[in-house]
Each structure stands twice: as structure tokens, then as C-alpha cells.
Amino acid sequence: MDETVPPNEIPVLSEIEVAELASSETATSETDQARSEAEYERFIWANLKRNYAANYLHGMLGMTGFRLVNAPTFVPAYLYILASHGLGFLPAGLRMLASPNAIVGLGLSLQQVGQVISPIIGAAQIEHRKRVLPASILMGTLMRVQILGMAFAGWFFSGAPLLVAMLFFLLMLGLFSGAQRVAFQLVLGKVIPFSRRGRLQAWRNFTGGIIAAALTYAAGRYIIGGGPISIPSHFLGLSVFKNGYSTTFFLAFVLTSLGLTAFQLLIREPDPPKVRPRMRVSDRLRGLPALLRSDRGFAFFMLAQTCAVAGRIAAPFYILYAGATLHSLSGATLGIFGLANLGADTASNLLWGYLGDKSGFRSSFLIALLFWIGGTVLLILSHTMPAFFLAFAFLGAASSGYQMSSQTMVLEFGLREDMAMRLAFSSTAEGVMSSLGPLIGGLIAAVAGYLMVFYTSIGFEVVALGIVIFMVEEPRKRRMLGFTSP
């Protein structure tokens, strides 16, 4: 029996009935979306203690280890020593161009160059996923492998091969750190409410910084000491060099790996109500202008961030300038200034975190820039160990405030679905300047001296300060007024 309804008997809906049906479907969709948002919020608060502990342990142990590598003392000094003794194979003309200062700048630039592209590629691979933890663990593991490679290179290589290996591992470290930063910050943004992010970062950085400051001093004074690299000994038929820098890097690898393990075991990640559809990297790059036009505050924030990072061209040369002025670049000197830098970084975290939670991170961003300018001026005026100690303390506090403020402010602009790509674009802009900055700084130092590098740095920080004061509104205030979606 044919039950097909003849065309002339098919009921035709009036425009009013169609509108009512669409309105009903829209209301149902909005109800489902509201229910999903409520479930998402309930999951976050129900698992807050566990996720808080996971982020705390990961930050305390992970950042402790990374600070041993990223402190403006060990790696610049190590590269300077290697470049001073490992460039003999070059022709005389090239040796004049490849000065130790230029090699220091090149090494720090290579560490940053990976962050130019890898954040966007990483974000494109995770923004469509409801769970990003597996990608975070993979990127974190690959990042730590590079630090292990730096350690083994120092034990088994010497001279030019060791210098080349260090430059390679610094490049790979930057490559994986760019993608890791996006993934881990995205997890933080998903599991920790914005009203708790400041104090979490404050306490994890504070406790981790205490450990890092103590380890930095101990590594400089006792592990590296006065003779960081010695003649090889034989172990299992292999020639192994005693290298205090390698031992320090291996210690950093162990600490960061413990933090990553704790994070993987404890974290509980929710499924967000909405995610972006998967898109090609080229399509996301074409979407950058639209993303910036849709949020003027974020666009100017990225400009300010770029200028602030450009001001870091001087960072690798702080310790070299202090060593040249004091006529000492010994392990003890590295340990003392590393202690000042990381100690102030540690102590100031409580200020930055609680200030950010209470007033928003725009205020801490501004104060950090003022600290940076003041610390650089003090460094220029210093001629004694106590004065340099104070200058490194100011610079450490500034670095801490900038990192916490910039990374947290990015999470508070715009829509949640765009968070991964905002992190990626922000990291890429930072990576461009971070990769070019030390290289340009090294060339300036080789041609015009350290002071010109410092004056250039101050100029960029002043520009960043002006942009934030006059062009960037506190994103949390806009969110509370309903201009952006949570």
C-alpha cells in the first residue's frame, strides 16, 4: 500500500508558524547550551582542589628546573666559554664576526626562534579537541628531552662539536616550548577559574622559586665552581668530561620530569561545551586580522607585549656586563647573581599573584615594566657587588611580573573557543621578538658595547608602558560588564 502523501495534500506552514518553530528550536538550543555551561562550571569547581594541586606541583617542580636553564646566568656564561674556546677552526675573518658575544646572542635567538611558528601549529592541532591533556604531556616530554640532550652533550663532547650541539638543543628546546606553552596554558584556563589563577601561580612560583634560588646558588658555587669543564675520564670505555653545566642541566631535567609526572597523574580535564571546528593552519593565520579587529584591546596588548619582549634583547648581557665590570665571571659570581635574580623573582610572585586576582593583571603588567626599566638603569649605574645584586633582584622581580601578567591576561580576552589561538598568536609575536632580540643585541654589543644594548632595551620598555597605559583596558573589567564571553 502506497502511503505517500500527494503533493497537493502536503501541509504548508505559514511564515508565522515557521518563525514559531525556529524560535522553539533556538530556545531549546539555548537551553541545552546553558545546561552544558552549568555542567562545565560544576565540573571545574568539583575538581578544583585536585586540579589546583596538579598545577601547583607541576609549576613548583617544573618551573624550578626550567629556571636553572632559563636564568640569565648559566646558559649565556656557558655559551660565552664555549665560544671563546671552540671557534679556533674558523678562518680569521669569520672569527672576528663570530665573537663570543655574537654567539651568545645567536644561542638565545635560536632558543626563541622555535616559538615563532610552533605555537600556531600547536594551537591548530588542539583547539578542536575537547581534551588537550595528551598533547600537553607529549609536548612537555619532548621539551624535557632537549634539556637531557644538553646535559649529555657536555659530558661526551668538547670544543666546536659541543658548541654546535648546544645551539641545536637550544633551537629544539624553543621549538617544543612554544607548543607546550599553548597547551598547558589552555589546560590552566579550562580547569582553574580566573579568580584563582593569580594566587595559584603566585604560590607555585614562590615555592618553586625558593628551591630554584637555592639550587642556582649551589650549582654556581659547588657544581660549576671555578673550573666548570675539565679533562675527560674514562667510564665504560667512553671518554666522559666532568662538566658542571651538564650536571646542572641534568638536575633540571629530573625536576621538570617529576613535575610533569605529577601533573599527568592528578589532573582532571573537563569537556568544554563548544570547541572550534578543525581548520588548517593557513586558514587560522588568515583569521588573525579578524581576531584582532574584533578585540581592539587584545590587538594593542599584543603590540605592547611585543615591545616589552623586544626590551629583553639585553637579558643575555646582564651577567656579562656585571662580570666585565667586576672582572669576575666565576661560578661563585654566577651563583650570587643567580640567587638575587631568582630570589626576587620568587618573593615578588606573591605580590603579582594577589595583585592580579584583586585588581586584574593589567596593573601588575604596568608595575613589572617599571621594575624592568628601573633595574636596567640601576645595572648601568652599578660598580660594586651589592649594587649589581640589587639590580639583578629588580630584573628578576620584573621578569616574574611580566611572565605572570602577560600569560594570564591572554586568557581573559575574548571568547573561550578562541583561547588556544589567542595564546598561539601571543606566543608567536613574543617568539618573533625573542628570537631576533638576542641576536640583534649580540651584534649591538659587539659593535657598540653593552651600554647601547641597555639603552635600546629601556626605550622599548617605555614604549610598551605607554601603550598599556593609554590603549589597553583591563580585560577582566570588560568581561564583568559583559563585553566578552566567559
Task: Kindly give the residue locations of the regions a language model identified.
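Juxtamembrane intracellular "pre-TM" segments in multi-pass secondary transporters
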Residues: E30-K49, E269-L303, F483-P486
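Helix-loop junctions on the cytosolic side of multi-pass membrane transporters
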Residues: Y245, L260-P277, I469-G482
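Loop-to-transmembrane helix entry/capping segments in MFS-fold secondary transporters
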Residues: N101-A102, F194-R204, G331-A332, R416-S427
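Helix-loop boundary and gating motifs at the non-cytosolic
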Residues: E30-I117, G122, I126, S136-G140, ...
